[in-house]
């Protein structure tokens, strides 16, 4: 790897592009180490994501009764699985020293799937939180109206909305040649970027810069902040209701879905933080992005393989590891049997005596 491969920096780029390259603040050796680590991490994520989410999809579609909960988790698994299927192109991109050989269409599709996965997952988790909240606050109404058909309808709306919010990737993602390599990047100005998208002394395009800000802030608000606030409000309401109903001692209530939600926001928080910082690139040292952006992206991508792992290790007491893997998945994904009976003291007595596998998916 020659030194000239690292002669680009964030100061060289107009505000309307978002290249994925190794920056000059990294030495050739450091850049090679980062690239190897990314290839290794992405490969592990891809393998775990395809196998884990694929297993969840098979288990739900072939082995389990269709319930509202299984509909939620089936859609989560499908969204993660689709992204992981296309993750090898990102692995190859890093392995080829950031030389994109898959064409402009795949450049658009691969980034679209990453953003679509983010929106689909966060919207599903938000709806699940709202569903749990309604089940606690209005158990009778929930028992009468909470149906598989309604869950499928909600999922359809979520997928369509996620497609709409992810569509900027299909418009602005582009490829261009730089230093003898083809890069996959965001061309928010929609300028002809075939020859040189990053001139030595670029003129900031106000239109492209404005689009960049709108897309970044929209993703942060719709894909992180607003869902996070709604989810937090739902679970604060649930905790308050359970405490007033003397159910605070219920055995680890909502532990799996709550852990999945917390994991999602922890994984995506660095990603949004760095892309918001990128809007103020001039006031942030370029070295901050050199390792921060690749690391934040890797952490965000890792979320796509986390859910099956959480299902397995939290479906039952982890100490009982002798329990078969398939049993753990079924127990974790099964419909909770007592969601509509929270206010009842009799249900509390019953729930307290239930096996962990019966309450694990609350």
UniProtKB/Swiss-Prot annotation:
Secretion signal, residue range per the UniProt entry: none
Domain of life: Eukaryota
Similarity comment text for this entry: Belongs to the chemokine-like receptor (CMKLR) family.
Protein name: Chemerin-like receptor 1
Region: Disordered, residue numbers: 336-362
Record membrane topology: Multi-pass membrane protein
GO CC annotations, alphabetized: plasma membrane
TM stretches of this protein: 38-58, 71-91, 109-129, 152-172, 220-240, 256-276, 282-302
């Amino acid at each position: 790897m020659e030194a000239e491969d690292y002669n680009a920096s964030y100061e060289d780029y107009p505000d309307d592009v978002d290249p994925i390259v190794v920056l000059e603040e990294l030495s050739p050796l450091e850049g090679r180490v980062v690239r190897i680590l990314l290839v290794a991490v992405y490969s592990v994520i891809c393998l775990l994501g395809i196998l884990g989410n694929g297993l969840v999809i098979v288990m739900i579609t072939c082995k389990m009764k269709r319930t509202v909960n299984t509909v939620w988790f089936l859609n989560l698994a499908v969204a993660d699985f689709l992204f992981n299927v296309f993750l090898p192109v990102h692995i190859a991109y890093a392995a080829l020293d950031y030389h994109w050989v898959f064409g402009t269409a795949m450049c658009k599709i691969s980034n679209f799937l990453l953003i679509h996965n983010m929106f689909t997952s966060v919207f599903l988790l938000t709806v699940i939180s709202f569903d749990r909240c309604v089940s606690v606050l209005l158990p009778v109404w929930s028992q009468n109206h909470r149906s598989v058909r309604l869950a499928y309808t909600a999922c359809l709306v979520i997928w369509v909305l996620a497609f709409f919010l992810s569509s900027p990737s299909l418009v602005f993602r582009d490829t261009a040649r730089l230093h003898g390599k083809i890069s996959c990047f965001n061309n928010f100005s929609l300028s002809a970027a075939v020859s040189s998208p990053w001139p030595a002394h670029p003129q900031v395009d106000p239109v492209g810069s404005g689009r960049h800000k709108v897309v970044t802030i929209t993703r942060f608000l719709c894909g992180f902040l607003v869902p996070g606030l709604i989810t937090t409000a739902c679970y604060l309401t649930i905790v308050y209701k359970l405490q007033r109903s003397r159910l605070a001692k219920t055995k680890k209530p909502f532990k799996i879905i709550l852990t999945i939600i917390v994991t999602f926001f922890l994984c995506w928080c660095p990603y949004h933080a760095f892309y918001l910082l990128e809007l103020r690139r001039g006031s942030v040292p370029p070295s901050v992005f050199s390792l921060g952006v690749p690391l934040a992206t890797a952490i965000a991508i890792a979320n796509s393989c986390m859910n099956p792992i959480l299902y397995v290790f939290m479906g039952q007491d982890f100490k009982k590891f002798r329990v078969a893997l398939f049993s753990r998945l079924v127990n974790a994904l099964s419909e909770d049997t007592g969601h509509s009976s929270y206010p009842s003291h009799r249900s509390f007595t019953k729930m307290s005596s239930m096996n962990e596998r019966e309450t694990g998916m609350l």
